[in-house]
């Protein structure tokens, strides 16, 4: 039985309903993700489907990795905007820090995963470079950057995401996760779902990126895979943190955190807030149990411009995904059904009662001074 049987079966699917199968070379026997990962355990082969670049080609594309081309930076290294010459194409080039968080294994995993798995809601890997000790990945360029840029790190004067766009982004991310869980063979556990890893195309279609921590999921009668605990604090499922046991429900929990960020406009961990509000999930849990307080979770920057029913149901979805007991969490297919219904209802609903609108307005005014500082900062992919 669906976890969201209370939702209508009507599904809004602006992003296409078909789920492509894992990638395989034309005129060749079908290869599962597991078979190819095992075959390429010591390094990617030349027939992976991704283009192999020389370091010189990528240096030329990024103007020798000039600062003016830098669009993102983190523990893994730096991301540059580049332009390939043949064929002419704008790309994003991730140059891994040789002493950074993403090592040889993570580089290999990302090349293999993105060479095999193709979906509208996964970022497209164009190629890679493994010259000497240089490790670089070349992706399609995403001009809008990450969800984090538009939700948590707004530039001064930048317009916040409206409610319908937030639901659209959540739906796209959910479809990407569902593809990994249900269509890949064997299933893939993403393990690093967070707002900075969700990239946006010009139409705000969400694409999952950074697959270095992805792991092949359990097969047959196996219920979980054991793994060293990795990921980003605040997004990791509590049972995974405690035991190292990884399941697809670990990704569902992380999705619930991202959905809560989309609803609230708050960071999952924010040490600049009062102590009882610094952990987003901990702060939200008592509100989940009191529907009369749901409006308190809405992002003040929305200024009350959202359908009350859509907000309430989005919060209900987030609460299910964040359930302490993994088996109670929904499947991503159920999440997609629920969010698709929300997308449909958001386009046809009004914003609720005058009393609720006044509460929203007051909440917005109370938050203006707060949000004018912490959420307006500089950040990239």
Curated annotation (Swiss-Prot):
The active site is at 192 (proton acceptor). It is a lipid-anchor. The modification Phosphoserine is found at residues 196, 226. ATP binds at residues 71-79, 94. GO terms for biological process: defense response. A lipid is attached at residue 3 (S-palmitoyl cysteine). It comes from the Eukaryota. Residues 16-41, 347-381 are annotated as: Disordered. May be involved in plant defense signaling. This is Probable serine/threonine-protein kinase PBL25. The lineage of its organism: Eukaryota, Viridiplantae, Streptophyta, Embryophyta, Tracheophyta. The gene is PBL25.
């Amino acid at each position: 039985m669906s976890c969201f049987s209370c939702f209508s079966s009507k599904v809004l699917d602006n992003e296409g309903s078909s789920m492509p199968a894992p990638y395989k070379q034309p005129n060749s026997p079908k290869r599962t993700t597991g078979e190819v990962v095992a075959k390429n355990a010591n390094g990617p082969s030349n027939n992976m489907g991704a283009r192999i670049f020389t370091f010189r080609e990528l240096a030329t594309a990024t103007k020798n990795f000039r600062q003016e081309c830098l669009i993102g930076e983190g523990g893994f290294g730096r991301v540059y905007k580049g332009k390939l010459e043949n064929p002419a194409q704008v790309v994003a080039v991730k140059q891994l820090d040789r002493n950074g968080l993403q090592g040889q294994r993570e580089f290999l995993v990302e090349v293999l995963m993105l060479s095999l798995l193709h979906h509208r809601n996964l970022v497209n890997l164009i190629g890679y470079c493994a010259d000497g000790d240089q490790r670089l990945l070349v992706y399609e360029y995403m001009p809008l950057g990450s969800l984090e840029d538009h939700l948590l790190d707004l530039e001064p004067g930048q317009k916040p995401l409206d409610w319908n766009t937030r639901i659209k982004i959540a739906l796209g991310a959910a479809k990407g996760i569902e593809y990994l869980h249900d269509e890949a063979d064997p299933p893939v556990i993403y393990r690093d779902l967070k707002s900075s890893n969700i990239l946006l195309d010009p139409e705000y279609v969400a694409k999952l990126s950074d697959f270095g921590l992805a792991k092949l999921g359990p097969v047959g009668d196996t219920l979980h895979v054991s793994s060293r605990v990795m990921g980003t604090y605040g997004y990791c499922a509590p049972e995974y943190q405690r035991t190292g046991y990884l399941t697809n429900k670990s990704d569902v929990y992380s999705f619930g955190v991202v959905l809560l960020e989309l609803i609230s406009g708050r960071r999952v961990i924010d040490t600049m807030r009062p102590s009882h509000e610094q952990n987003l999930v901990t702060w939200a849990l008592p509100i989940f149990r009191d529907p009369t307080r749901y409006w308190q979770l809405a992002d003040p920057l929305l200024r009350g411009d959202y359908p009350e029913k859509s907000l309430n149901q989005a919060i209900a979805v987030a609460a299910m995904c964040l359930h302490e007991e993994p088996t109670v969490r929904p499947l991503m297919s159920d999440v997609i059904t629920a969010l698709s219904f929300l997308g449909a209802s958001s386009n046809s609903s009004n914003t609720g009662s005058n009393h609720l609108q006044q509460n929203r307005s007051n909440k917005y005014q109370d938050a203006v001074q707060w949000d004018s500082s912490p959420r307006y900062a500089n950040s990239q992919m």
